[in-house]
Amino acid sequence: MYRRIHFAVMAIESGARKLGISGKEMHDRLSKQGLIQNRLIKRYEELHTQSLDWVADDISETLLNWEAGL
């Protein structure tokens, strides 16, 4: 479980940098949408093989889409 949590933290921080927001704000917004558990943790096996830059783009885009109701 440690690896999944470490991966999620790295993805959250990298996504926050992409969006120009704090890690806390990114965490709060992802948490509100259920994306930490349902995207980063549950899809760890699939996502951790990608580059951190790719994961940051993916989680940022997913967050914006979910917030927009897409």
Q: Which residues does each predicted region cover?
A:
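N-terminal acidic leader/helix
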Residues: M1-M26
